[in-house]
């Protein structure tokens, strides 16, 4: 991995909040790839048998439908099983919010910043395509990827919405999932551009947006 140079202002801020040496170590290691089985279309064991032809699979401890995946092939997204919607390429940490939300099959749920759809499709799977999900995003150009992923994964209980729900009053939901904009500092190893763009003003701006 390319050597990472941290800004002095970055180090001054985060050395107060965490073990900065451990943070730097993790930031220079590759992120383990992981997938979530889409149980709307296939069983966990059936997909596991199919993928073990090409890959080594290890269970993600906190999600029984998910696996860390490794092997010589890197083109997971080109597999026919992916095109058919049998699995979603999803980071292990991203699996946690829908599990914590713990949706019921009769819930009305708002996914407030849904695109590209990893958590929306996971919610639909947990709800067994029952209940109703409003999959919203504030940016029109992000809705295409959301629509494609919902179609690919066979999601039937979801309506796509283009709204700024921070300005809309009077709606009630059983549960709301909000993946709010963040600094992305936990994902530096995926994109060094995150570190290059980082500055204190950006942190303050994002913090104000999250509070809103």
Each language-model region and where it sits:
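S-adenosylmethionine
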Residues: 1-212
